[in-house]
């Protein structure tokens, strides 16, 4: 089994604490609301939202991915860090055993934030994961982040 790493970062005009609260802590409710064309539902199928919780994300009709199940590994409210592992779903295919993501939101100069994502793709057997496959996960996260960001810009009184 090989492990393939992918790192990316993006910026947001939303302050780190507010973005963490909306995107991570309330993502189960907010993401389907702000991006129904991509995600139809996010639900905890096991646990209360903390470490060990299993979440099921169901993607909207027409998406190449039907669903994924993620296990929450860590939520650090002080350092705005969220670690989770994709453990099930057609996104894994026959190449991947799991995908682990570490997401950290840090304050950026000027009041916005920097979102840093580090992903580890754990391949089954001798399969290899190419850059395009790894980039797809980042692009989906970026789209969801931008939808949350737009919502927060339009609803300035929420998630403060």
Swiss-Prot record:
GO biological process, one term: defense response
Entry keywords, A to Z: Allergen, Pathogenesis-related protein, Plant defense
Xref: SMART domains: Bet_v_1
Record-given protein name: Major pollen allergen Car b 1 isoform 2
Entry-linked PANTHER family: OS08G0374000 PROTEIN-RELATED, STRESS-INDUCED PROTEIN SAM22
Organism: Carpinus betulus
GO CC field: cytoplasm; nucleus
Keyword Disulfide bond belongs to the record: no
